[in-house]
Amino acid sequence: MTAPLHLSGVVLPEAEHRDVWVRDGRFTFERVPGAETVSRGGWLLPGLVDAHCHVGIGAGGTAIEDRDATRQQALDERAAGVLALRDCGSPVDTRFLDDEPDLPHIVRAGRHIAAPRRYIPDLAVEVEPADLVAAVRVQARRGDGWVKLVGDWIDRTQGDLSPEWPADVLAAAVAAAHEEGARVTAHTFGTDALPGLLGAGIDCIEHGTGLTEDLVAEMAARGTAVVPTLVNVENFPGFAAAGEKRFPAYASTMRRLYAQSGAVVRAAFEAGVPVYAGTDAGGGIEHGVIADEVRALHTAGLPAEAALAAASWAARDWLGLPCIEEGALADVVVYDTDPRADLDTLRRPRRMILRGVVVG
């Protein structure tokens, strides 16, 4: 049982000034006698979400064996106001973190599934197309309602990005995941893998820098989401430079995708594609940079409130997590100023409550 708490301020997204209490770890709008007032005034935002990160992957794309280091990644996210993580693939079993109530909620996708030698070494479960359906079922049962495919990667025999899976295999794999009660998402940088993935009924696209006008329209019609990870897309020029000598076609592709990335995000949003904020933290990107991603979404063309929603109430709803409502688990971040008016406010949380306990 947690101690009763009291907060007051402007509750977002409704933008209504309210008194909010926390009783037994859950929100209530009924006065709780004896509750300690832990925050008065300011703006109350449903706990932030990093909708694409990798807990347990360290610098250089290697698995972290040390539990304290893995725990620190979660703490770094929490310090940024992120109270829920969508882990889009990790070779490390991070279930031990669920036993620590002061750490963010984690919604897992199991391990990446890739074709042989078509992803970062040792991170993915690598299978031939004939074994994809079985691998998807395994990861669906290991995750928390998501499966992560690698949709494209550099094919060294061709010297450029190319799809990893035949369309008919993708259709069977997505159907299998849905039978298991899981949604499916896929890493894609380029364009060629996207028609097969969308045709298979995939639920989300990660990065999506190769989206075209027709593919955006198809995503909007299907309700397929995109998590652009613009913080990671900033690395594309470096990827191109690193591959220039051996794979000039790949380098050219990555530069083109980088150049169009902002316009792609803007087009997706304007077409009605659900857009969510994810940093791709883990590996080469530090955890705790969600404010950078929200700012990047706004720079790309999302209105400030939409960019904020992509990392808060909209993302929580997408993942089945409640906001500030009667009976909901109390996850809230308080800011001194309105984050809708100044997105950089996200860098300065005043108070954080996670599962009904003050953690910052």
Where are the regions a protein language model picked out?
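Histidine/acidic-residue-rich catalytic or RNA/ligand-binding cores of hydrolases
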Residues: 59-62, 194-200, 232-245, 261-263, ...
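His/Asp/Glu-enriched, well-ordered alpha-helical/loop segment
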Residues: 179, 258-338
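N-terminal metal-binding scaffold of metallo-dependent hydrolase/deaminase domains
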Residues: 1-33, 43-44, 337-342, 357-358
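Divalent metal-coordination and catalytic microenvironments
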Residues: 25, 41, 49-52, 81, ...
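Acidic/histidine-rich helix-loop elements
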Residues: 55-67, 116-126, 156-163, 238, ...
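Histidine/acidic residue-rich metal-binding segments in metalloenzymes
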Residues: 33, 130-226, 242-243, 255-275, ...
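Active-site environment of divalent metal-dependent phosphoester hydrolases
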Residues: 56-58, 91-95, 114-116, 153-156, ...
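Metal-associated gating/positioning segment near the N- to mid-region
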Residues: 42-101, 117-122, 200
